[in-house]
Regions:
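Conserved tyrosine-mediated DNA breakage-rejoining catalytic core shared by Y-recombinases
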Residues: 186, 190-228
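N-terminal core-binding DNA-recognition domain of tyrosine recombinases/integrases
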Residues: 6, 24-37, 44-141, 161
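Active-site/catalytic core of tyrosine-dependent DNA strand-transfer enzymes
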Residues: 223-276
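Short, polar N-cap/turn motifs at the start of nucleic acid-interacting alpha helices
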Residues: 198, 275-276, 295-315, 321
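Basic, Lys/Arg- and aromatic-enriched nucleic-acid-binding interface segment
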Residues: 152-185
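Short basic/aromatic active-site micro-motif
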Residues: 169-170, 258, 275-294, 311
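A short, glycine-centered helix-capping/turn motif at helix boundaries
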Residues: 119, 177-190, 293-295, 306
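DNA breakage-rejoining catalytic core of tyrosine-based enzymes
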Residues: 136-155, 213-225, 241-242, 246
Protein backbone atom coordinates (compact mmCIF):
# COMPACT_ATOMS: atom_id res chain seq x y z
CA UNK A 1 0.00 0.00 0.00
CA UNK A 2 1.46 3.37 -1.00
CA UNK A 3 2.23 5.98 1.65
CA UNK A 4 -0.55 8.39 0.70
CA UNK A 5 -3.20 5.66 0.71
CA UNK A 6 -1.93 4.39 4.06
CA UNK A 7 -2.05 7.93 5.47
CA UNK A 8 -5.63 8.34 4.24
CA UNK A 9 -6.55 4.99 5.79
CA UNK A 10 -5.23 6.12 9.19
CA UNK A 11 -7.21 9.36 8.94
CA UNK A 12 -10.34 7.33 8.13
CA UNK A 13 -9.76 5.06 11.13
CA UNK A 14 -9.26 7.97 13.51
CA UNK A 15 -12.31 9.77 12.12
CA UNK A 16 -14.45 6.64 12.45
CA UNK A 17 -13.41 6.43 16.10
CA UNK A 18 -14.36 10.08 16.69
CA UNK A 19 -17.73 9.64 14.97
CA UNK A 20 -18.56 6.43 16.81
CA UNK A 21 -20.75 8.18 19.37
CA UNK A 22 -22.06 10.89 17.04
CA UNK A 23 -25.73 10.52 16.02
CA UNK A 24 -26.04 8.77 12.68
CA UNK A 25 -27.96 11.58 11.01
CA UNK A 26 -24.91 13.82 11.62
CA UNK A 27 -22.13 11.28 11.02
CA UNK A 28 -23.57 10.12 7.69
CA UNK A 29 -23.01 13.59 6.22
CA UNK A 30 -19.26 12.98 5.97
CA UNK A 31 -19.71 9.94 3.73
CA UNK A 32 -20.46 12.41 0.94
CA UNK A 33 -16.81 13.40 0.72
CA UNK A 34 -14.23 11.36 -1.14
CA UNK A 35 -11.09 12.81 0.45
CA UNK A 36 -10.31 11.69 3.99
CA UNK A 37 -8.62 15.03 4.67
CA UNK A 38 -11.78 16.89 3.58
CA UNK A 39 -13.93 14.67 5.81
CA UNK A 40 -11.63 15.37 8.74
CA UNK A 41 -11.54 19.16 8.39
CA UNK A 42 -15.29 19.38 7.75
CA UNK A 43 -15.95 17.26 10.83
CA UNK A 44 -13.81 19.68 12.87
CA UNK A 45 -15.84 22.63 11.52
CA UNK A 46 -19.18 20.94 12.31
CA UNK A 47 -17.99 19.61 15.68
CA UNK A 48 -16.75 23.01 16.87
CA UNK A 49 -19.95 24.71 15.73
CA UNK A 50 -22.16 22.15 17.51
CA UNK A 51 -20.08 22.38 20.69
CA UNK A 52 -20.55 26.16 20.61
CA UNK A 53 -24.32 25.66 20.23
CA UNK A 54 -24.26 23.36 23.28
CA UNK A 55 -22.15 25.76 25.37
CA UNK A 56 -24.35 28.74 24.53
CA UNK A 57 -27.68 27.04 25.22
CA UNK A 58 -28.83 26.95 21.60
CA UNK A 59 -29.04 23.18 22.02
CA UNK A 60 -30.10 22.11 25.48
CA UNK A 61 -28.12 18.87 25.71
CA UNK A 62 -24.89 17.83 27.39
CA UNK A 63 -22.90 16.62 24.38
CA UNK A 64 -23.00 16.07 20.63
CA UNK A 65 -23.86 12.42 21.20
CA UNK A 66 -27.18 13.53 22.74
CA UNK A 67 -28.25 15.82 19.87
CA UNK A 68 -31.52 14.93 18.16
CA UNK A 69 -33.19 15.99 14.92
CA UNK A 70 -35.43 18.32 16.94
CA UNK A 71 -32.37 20.05 18.39
CA UNK A 72 -31.09 20.81 14.90
CA UNK A 73 -34.43 22.40 14.04
CA UNK A 74 -34.06 24.70 17.05
CA UNK A 75 -30.85 26.28 15.69
CA UNK A 76 -31.49 29.61 13.96
CA UNK A 77 -29.53 31.62 11.43
CA UNK A 78 -28.91 34.20 14.16
CA UNK A 79 -27.24 31.52 16.29
CA UNK A 80 -24.90 30.69 13.42
CA UNK A 81 -24.21 34.38 12.72
CA UNK A 82 -23.26 34.92 16.35
CA UNK A 83 -20.90 31.93 16.21
CA UNK A 84 -19.27 33.14 12.99
CA UNK A 85 -18.92 36.66 14.40
CA UNK A 86 -17.12 35.31 17.46
CA UNK A 87 -14.75 33.44 15.15
CA UNK A 88 -14.19 36.60 13.09
CA UNK A 89 -13.57 38.78 16.13
CA UNK A 90 -11.19 36.36 17.83
CA UNK A 91 -13.44 35.74 20.83
CA UNK A 92 -12.96 31.97 20.50
CA UNK A 93 -9.22 32.18 19.93
CA UNK A 94 -7.24 33.46 16.99
CA UNK A 95 -9.43 35.60 14.71
CA UNK A 96 -10.55 33.87 11.51
CA UNK A 97 -10.11 35.62 8.17
CA UNK A 98 -13.17 36.36 6.05
CA UNK A 99 -12.04 33.68 3.60
CA UNK A 100 -11.92 31.16 6.45
CA UNK A 101 -15.35 32.27 7.70
CA UNK A 102 -16.82 31.81 4.22
CA UNK A 103 -15.29 28.36 3.92
CA UNK A 104 -16.94 27.30 7.18
CA UNK A 105 -20.21 28.94 6.19
CA UNK A 106 -20.20 26.94 2.95
CA UNK A 107 -19.59 23.70 4.86
CA UNK A 108 -22.46 24.53 7.22
CA UNK A 109 -24.70 25.26 4.25
CA UNK A 110 -23.85 21.88 2.71
CA UNK A 111 -24.54 20.24 6.08
CA UNK A 112 -27.97 21.86 6.45
CA UNK A 113 -28.82 21.07 2.85
CA UNK A 114 -28.02 17.44 3.57
CA UNK A 115 -30.23 17.53 6.69
CA UNK A 116 -33.06 19.11 4.71
CA UNK A 117 -32.76 16.59 1.88
CA UNK A 118 -33.02 13.80 4.44
CA UNK A 119 -36.04 15.46 6.07
CA UNK A 120 -34.18 16.07 9.34
CA UNK A 121 -34.78 19.83 9.24
CA UNK A 122 -37.42 21.96 7.54
CA UNK A 123 -35.05 24.49 6.01
CA UNK A 124 -31.44 25.48 5.50
CA UNK A 125 -30.90 28.22 8.08
CA UNK A 126 -27.61 29.22 6.44
CA UNK A 127 -29.60 30.47 3.44
CA UNK A 128 -30.94 33.27 5.68
CA UNK A 129 -27.47 34.65 6.41
CA UNK A 130 -26.98 37.75 4.19
CA UNK A 131 -24.62 36.87 1.35
CA UNK A 132 -22.53 40.00 1.77
CA UNK A 133 -22.18 39.72 5.55
CA UNK A 134 -18.75 38.09 5.35
CA UNK A 135 -17.80 39.21 1.87
CA UNK A 136 -14.08 39.65 1.36
CA UNK A 137 -12.49 41.85 -1.24
CA UNK A 138 -10.69 39.23 -3.30
CA UNK A 139 -7.75 40.75 -5.05
CA UNK A 140 -5.87 38.70 -7.58
CA UNK A 141 -2.35 38.17 -6.34
CA UNK A 142 0.37 37.83 -8.93
CA UNK A 143 2.33 34.64 -8.42
CA UNK A 144 5.85 35.02 -7.09
CA UNK A 145 8.41 33.62 -9.49
CA UNK A 146 12.14 33.53 -8.75
CA UNK A 147 14.55 34.62 -11.47
CA UNK A 148 16.91 32.10 -13.06
CA UNK A 149 19.77 33.81 -11.23
CA UNK A 150 18.00 33.46 -7.87
CA UNK A 151 17.38 29.76 -8.51
CA UNK A 152 21.03 29.16 -9.42
CA UNK A 153 22.17 31.08 -6.34
CA UNK A 154 19.80 28.97 -4.22
CA UNK A 155 21.17 25.73 -5.71
CA UNK A 156 24.73 26.89 -4.98
CA UNK A 157 23.77 27.54 -1.35
CA UNK A 158 22.19 24.08 -1.10
CA UNK A 159 25.38 22.57 -2.53
CA UNK A 160 27.77 24.53 -0.30
CA UNK A 161 25.76 24.83 2.88
CA UNK A 162 25.73 21.25 4.18
CA UNK A 163 28.66 18.96 4.99
CA UNK A 164 26.50 15.82 4.79
CA UNK A 165 26.97 14.49 1.24
CA UNK A 166 23.73 12.50 1.29
CA UNK A 167 21.74 15.58 2.32
CA UNK A 168 23.33 17.71 -0.39
CA UNK A 169 22.69 15.25 -3.22
CA UNK A 170 19.15 14.53 -1.98
CA UNK A 171 18.24 18.21 -1.56
CA UNK A 172 19.56 19.17 -4.98
CA UNK A 173 17.60 16.28 -6.53
CA UNK A 174 14.45 17.56 -4.79
CA UNK A 175 14.95 21.10 -6.09
CA UNK A 176 15.72 19.88 -9.61
CA UNK A 177 12.69 17.57 -9.61
CA UNK A 178 10.31 20.38 -8.58
CA UNK A 179 12.01 22.77 -11.02
CA UNK A 180 11.91 20.16 -13.77
CA UNK A 181 8.30 19.04 -13.38
CA UNK A 182 6.24 21.47 -11.29
CA UNK A 183 5.35 18.72 -8.82
CA UNK A 184 3.87 19.89 -5.50
CA UNK A 185 6.01 19.28 -2.38
CA UNK A 186 3.13 17.29 -0.83
CA UNK A 187 3.10 15.03 -3.89
CA UNK A 188 6.87 14.72 -3.76
CA UNK A 189 7.00 13.44 -0.19
CA UNK A 190 4.24 10.93 -0.96
CA UNK A 191 6.28 9.35 -3.76
CA UNK A 192 7.69 5.86 -3.39
CA UNK A 193 10.74 4.60 -5.26
CA UNK A 194 8.59 2.57 -7.66
CA UNK A 195 6.67 5.70 -8.73
CA UNK A 196 9.71 6.74 -10.77
CA UNK A 197 9.90 5.66 -14.41
CA UNK A 198 13.16 6.94 -15.80
CA UNK A 199 13.80 4.45 -18.57
CA UNK A 200 10.52 2.78 -19.60
CA UNK A 201 9.79 5.34 -22.33
CA UNK A 202 11.65 7.90 -24.44
CA UNK A 203 10.96 10.55 -21.82
CA UNK A 204 11.27 10.10 -18.03
CA UNK A 205 8.11 10.41 -15.96
CA UNK A 206 6.57 9.61 -12.58
CA UNK A 207 3.19 8.41 -11.44
CA UNK A 208 1.63 10.80 -8.94
CA UNK A 209 -1.37 10.59 -6.67
CA UNK A 210 -2.41 14.18 -7.19
CA UNK A 211 -4.04 16.72 -4.93
CA UNK A 212 -7.12 15.25 -3.20
CA UNK A 213 -6.70 11.91 -4.99
CA UNK A 214 -6.09 8.46 -3.54
CA UNK A 215 -7.14 6.29 -6.47
CA UNK A 216 -6.12 7.72 -9.84
CA UNK A 217 -2.46 8.27 -10.66
CA UNK A 218 -1.33 11.10 -12.93
CA UNK A 219 1.51 10.61 -15.38
CA UNK A 220 3.84 13.56 -14.86
CA UNK A 221 6.86 14.17 -17.09
CA UNK A 222 10.16 15.59 -15.89
CA UNK A 223 13.10 17.33 -17.50
CA UNK A 224 16.28 15.59 -18.60
CA UNK A 225 18.15 17.64 -16.02
CA UNK A 226 15.85 16.42 -13.23
CA UNK A 227 16.42 12.84 -14.38
CA UNK A 228 20.19 13.33 -14.25
CA UNK A 229 20.14 14.56 -10.65
CA UNK A 230 17.69 11.83 -9.64
CA UNK A 231 20.05 9.19 -11.05
CA UNK A 232 22.85 10.58 -8.89
CA UNK A 233 20.60 10.62 -5.84
CA UNK A 234 19.36 7.05 -6.45
CA UNK A 235 22.94 5.75 -6.37
CA UNK A 236 23.49 7.53 -3.05
CA UNK A 237 20.10 6.36 -1.74
CA UNK A 238 20.96 2.73 -2.52
CA UNK A 239 24.17 2.98 -0.48
CA UNK A 240 22.30 4.80 2.30
CA UNK A 241 19.56 2.15 2.71
CA UNK A 242 22.01 -0.78 2.54
CA UNK A 243 24.30 0.70 5.18
CA UNK A 244 21.39 1.41 7.51
CA UNK A 245 19.24 -1.60 6.55
CA UNK A 246 16.28 0.64 5.71
CA UNK A 247 13.19 -0.98 4.21
CA UNK A 248 11.12 2.20 3.72
CA UNK A 249 10.03 2.55 0.08
CA UNK A 250 9.91 6.36 0.25
CA UNK A 251 11.75 8.03 -2.62
CA UNK A 252 13.22 10.76 -0.44
CA UNK A 253 14.56 9.69 2.94
CA UNK A 254 15.61 11.70 5.98
CA UNK A 255 18.64 11.11 8.19
CA UNK A 256 16.20 9.57 10.68
CA UNK A 257 15.79 6.69 8.19
CA UNK A 258 12.22 7.56 7.30
CA UNK A 259 10.23 9.45 4.69
CA UNK A 260 11.04 13.14 4.47
CA UNK A 261 8.36 15.50 5.72
CA UNK A 262 6.92 18.48 3.90
CA UNK A 263 8.20 20.66 6.74
CA UNK A 264 11.76 19.44 6.21
CA UNK A 265 11.63 20.43 2.55
CA UNK A 266 10.15 23.85 3.34
CA UNK A 267 12.83 24.30 6.00
CA UNK A 268 15.82 23.72 3.75
CA UNK A 269 14.30 25.93 1.04
CA UNK A 270 13.97 28.72 3.58
CA UNK A 271 17.43 28.17 5.05
CA UNK A 272 19.38 28.15 1.80
CA UNK A 273 17.43 30.92 0.07
CA UNK A 274 17.27 33.24 3.10
CA UNK A 275 13.49 32.93 2.96
CA UNK A 276 13.24 34.20 -0.63
CA UNK A 277 12.24 30.92 -2.34
CA UNK A 278 9.73 28.31 -1.27
CA UNK A 279 8.76 25.09 -3.10
CA UNK A 280 5.54 26.37 -4.68
CA UNK A 281 7.43 29.26 -6.28
CA UNK A 282 9.32 26.73 -8.38
CA UNK A 283 6.01 25.25 -9.49
CA UNK A 284 5.04 28.73 -10.70
CA UNK A 285 8.46 29.03 -12.33
CA UNK A 286 7.71 25.84 -14.31
CA UNK A 287 4.29 27.11 -15.40
CA UNK A 288 5.69 30.44 -16.54
CA UNK A 289 8.70 28.97 -18.34
CA UNK A 290 6.62 26.27 -20.04
CA UNK A 291 4.11 28.85 -21.28
CA UNK A 292 6.86 31.18 -22.51
CA UNK A 293 8.51 28.31 -24.40
CA UNK A 294 5.34 26.93 -26.00
CA UNK A 295 2.77 29.75 -25.91
CA UNK A 296 0.28 26.95 -25.22
CA UNK A 297 -1.64 27.22 -21.95
CA UNK A 298 -3.00 23.69 -22.42
CA UNK A 299 0.54 22.32 -21.97
CA UNK A 300 0.76 24.19 -18.67
CA UNK A 301 -2.63 22.91 -17.51
CA UNK A 302 -1.68 19.34 -18.42
CA UNK A 303 1.74 19.40 -16.75
CA UNK A 304 0.68 21.22 -13.57
CA UNK A 305 -2.67 19.38 -13.50
CA UNK A 306 -4.86 22.41 -12.94
CA UNK A 307 -8.56 21.53 -13.00
CA UNK A 308 -9.34 23.99 -15.75
CA UNK A 309 -7.74 26.30 -18.28
CA UNK A 310 -9.05 29.39 -16.50
CA UNK A 311 -6.94 28.67 -13.42
CA UNK A 312 -3.80 28.10 -15.48
CA UNK A 313 -4.42 31.17 -17.65
CA UNK A 314 -5.03 33.39 -14.62
CA UNK A 315 -1.55 32.70 -13.32
CA UNK A 316 0.55 32.33 -16.44
CA UNK A 317 -0.99 34.27 -19.34
CA UNK A 318 -0.14 37.96 -19.10
CA UNK A 319 -1.80 40.20 -21.67
CA UNK A 320 -0.53 43.70 -22.35
CA UNK A 321 -3.21 46.35 -23.05
CA UNK A 322 -1.16 47.82 -25.89
CA UNK A 323 -0.87 44.41 -27.57
CA UNK A 324 -4.66 44.08 -27.43
CA UNK A 325 -5.12 47.60 -28.82
CA UNK A 326 -2.72 46.92 -31.70
CA UNK A 327 -4.43 43.63 -32.58
CA UNK A 328 -7.92 45.16 -32.53
CA UNK A 329 -6.74 48.13 -34.62
CA UNK A 330 -5.84 45.73 -37.44
CA UNK A 331 -9.22 43.96 -37.50
Amino acid sequence: MCYKVEKQRKIEQKLAEELKNVPGFIADFFDRYKSSATKKINWIYIRDMLNWMLSNGCIKKDSISDITVKDMNDITSNNVIKYLNELKNGILGRANSLDSINTKKNVFSAFWNYLRQNKCVDENVIAYIPKNLYKSEKKFKEVEIPTDEEVEEFLKSVNDGNKNEFNVIRNIAIVQLIKGSGIRSEELINMDINDLHLYEEDRPYMMILGKGNIEIYDKVYMSERAKMYLEEYLIMRDIFIREREITDKALFLSNENKRMSKGAITSFFERYSDGRIYPHMLRHWVGTDLYNRTNNIMYVQKQLRHKNLETAAKYYVHIDDQDVANAVYLL
